Amino acid sequence: RILAFGGKEGEIGAEEFARLAERKNDSYVEMIAAITPDDVFPGILALLEALQAAGKKIALASASKNGPFLLEKMGLTRFFGAIADPGAVAHSKPAPDIFLAAAKGVGTDIRACLGIEDALAGVQAIKAAGALPVGVGRAQDLGDDIAIVAGTAELTLAYLEEVWRQAQR
């Protein structure tokens, strides 16, 4: 899509595209190597602690193959019962595959899951999977038919439980 948008579709072959994608990822990995627990988004540590204390199962459904590395760098791995491997699913977001894999990883029916996303493709994937989406961002970017918070600091166990209750009506 990026090549088409830039008017370069068909100018770069599959091998060159793969090489450039790998180079981009290598640069990204170098950049994220400096990440520490201080880089955890506001409210996320408290949310993970509250979810864990309440006995909730937590899984990561990231399209990034760097997800496990980032969790480790931020000291968050201990909270996750499963980390879905984006390389092991047939289709990426907006297909539901990664969310279905995450739910399976923690042994939970996807219909009993709530997914938190900051991108439209992720929200679409959560819906397609049959889980309940909660967006982080703006309604004009994520859709106006889901619960949305402006920032991660607003994500609390109480808020998520209320969103779940409202959706079950």
Residue ranges and their predicted role:
Residues 30-60:
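Short, acidic loop-to-helix structural element flanking the phosphoryl-transfer center
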Residues 45-56, 64-169:
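Asp-based, Mg2+/Mn2+-dependent phosphohydrolase catalytic module
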Residues 5-42:
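Metal-dependent phosphoesterase signature
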Residues 11-14, 38, 61, 74, ...:
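Non-catalytic, surface-exposed connector residues within folded enzymatic/regulatory domains
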Residues 1-12, 70, 103:
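Helix-loop "lid/cap" segments that line or gate small-molecule binding pockets
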Residues 3-7, 33, 75-76, 153:
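A generic structural signal for secondary-structure junctions
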Residues 28-29, 61-62, 117:
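Short beta-strands and strand-loop turn motifs
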